[in-house]
Amino acid sequence: MQHVISLHNGTPVSRFLPDPSESVVPGVAWGRFEEALTPAFWAAQAWMQELGGGEAFGLGDTLAEEVAACLLGGYGAPAEVGLAAYGRVRQAMRSTAVVDVGAIEAMLTMPLKVGDRLVRYRFARQRSRQLGECLARIADIDEAALDDISLRDTLTRLPGIGPKTASWVVRNRRASDEVAILDIHIVRACVHMGIFGGGATPARDYVGLESRFIGFCRAAGLRASLLDALMWRTMRSIGPSFAGLRPASNPSSTGGRSRGKTACPEVVAQAGTI
């Protein structure tokens, strides 16, 4: 067993994780929690995140606002730019009964202030058309009558909304553990652990990869919604340097330490067999 110790409100708290050589899912060992990007590392980090109050999901107060946030923050839009665009559009949505395509395009065409810079939104015309149609059709969705998967599937029928964006909306609206937001950061983390194969492509098999991710979360006793958000932040901070990391090796087959970046600065901990 591995003994993980952390400080919570100044008090040491601990939990135990399986031995590094044990499998969390077939073919994937837990690894050592103090070595970054192993399954045990993610389990320890998720546990500490929950100690600190968990995650706050949701960017909007209504389904329409959440769709706007996730669509504008989708493919090709850096997170900060997407949020800036959404902030501008949301203000109009809250002050005007109907926001038409022309108004949205005008808002997205104007430079956005991101930090101390002025930047332009890359897909102003395309996204304004998509969002305008989404807002026109979203009133027809009976959100309360749909379970998480059904809501996700319904949202994918809207223009510009694929399974990843739809899953993002559902996760944010419901803190759902039934869907996963499989962007490049989550895919890289899962490939590194061996949960996904090296050629994993959500565009070709979103549901299959999502099933593997959620299966891993359940086997590890983790909330998929929390782990998804945690992986996104961590892998995004690593950036392109992650490409140079080798996938974690299986301690049960090599007899050695898994290949991962060492150090988990938030943890005051020790690992051993007890």
Model-derived features: where do they sit?
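C-terminal accessory module of base-excision DNA glycosylases/AP lyases that mediates lesion recognition
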Residues: 1-55, 61, 127-136, 146-152, ...
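DNA-contacting interfaces and partner/effector-binding or oligomerization modules
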Residues: 48-87
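Short, amphipathic alpha-helical segments that act as regulatory/interfacial helices
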Residues: 68-76, 86-90, 131-139, 214, ...
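Short, flexible active-site loops
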Residues: 68-71, 113-120, 150-151, 166-172
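Residues at alpha-helix boundaries and short interhelical turns
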Residues: 75-79, 125, 159, 177, ...
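Short alpha-helix boundary/capping elements
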Residues: 75-80, 93-97, 139, 177, ...
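Alpha-helical ds-nucleic-acid-binding substructure associated with the helix-hairpin-helix region
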Residues: 86-159
